[in-house]
Amino acid sequence: MIIARIFGHLPIATTWEHHVTDILELARTKVLNNGEGLNKEEVLQVLQLDEARIPELLELAHEVRLKWCGEEVEVEGIISLKTGGCPEDCHFCSQSGLFESPVRSAWLDIAGLVEAAKQTQKSGATEFCIVAAVKGPDERLMSQLEEAVAAIKSEVDIEVAASIGILTQEQVDRLKAAGVHRYNHNLETARSYFPNVVTTHSWESRRETLRMVGEAGMEVCSGGIIGMGETLEQRAEFACDLAELNPTEVPMNFLDPRPGTPFADYEVLDTTDALRAIGAFRLALPKTILRFAGGRELTLGDLGTEQGLLGGINAVIVGNYLTTLGRPMEQDLDMLGKLRLPIKALNASV
């Protein structure tokens, strides 16, 4: 059995710690049987589980995702329409124009976006997300995105998502009319920790954009980065902040410290803490697409990535990210085949 092989190197505890007594049994009833996410206090207990119980946690999280999301894995590619030169000060991001990072501003043309969408579709992906490093779109960016979506949809059989910052109601309506079916705008971290990560705009402005997106009928995609110095209590708060959005998708990133940013010297999150977070987020969000995004290669490696895919994750970004290198697309597809996880677009094991 694959899951036994993957988790076999970690012993399963024979006794349970008093302060987390029966939290996984509670989750089995509340989440697995009833489809109800854990609350903040319960998520915190999961995040505090002893290392020896991580295999048990991930096995339960995998059962939850199979029951409430199905066995298929959603594959997505992302592309940057506008890279660098962002006026915001997100402390983790090398695309900010306020930091001395090696990233320089650049735009991709429509032909380049269409070609990238074609290559992404060939992998079996169902999602192609166009991203821009901006606080919010100006008219030039809106017009170019509308043109790009039309061009892609006319030539490529793939769903187009977008991530271009804080929106007005008029911009939300235009994206919906253009055919954008899912919109990504990450909350990034817990509301209480956000001022430690971003000071040039508010957590509430991000939340308001997501409210408008959902009310317009687009799918809501919002996640963030684990391991930016937040406490376990704030990590639990973040999971429940996201659950309140009723999102279609939550991308899980892990901090990959970027040169020149305020977080450049932060330590990489411990693998066991990353696995706890994956399991906990699945138990908080039982019916949501939970996607591996940036930082998994550094934080989890190959084995941890496999554990995550058998521990609650049911979607991946293939290829490179916005400013960091991912794994070659073929490696991820081979891994899904090894684990006998079917890709959604192909509807068959790879």
From Swiss-Prot:
Domain Radical SAM core, residue spans: 71-296
Residue pairs linked by disulfide bridges in the UniProt entry: none
The keyword Metal-binding is annotated on this UniProt entry: yes
Gene Ontology annotations of biological process type: biotin biosynthetic process
Positions bound to [2Fe-2S] cluster: 129, 221, 291
Function per UniProt: Catalyzes the conversion of dethiobiotin (DTB) to biotin by the insertion of a sulfur atom into dethiobiotin via a radical-based mechanism.
Protein name per the record: Biotin synthase 1
Gene giving rise to this polypeptide: bioB1
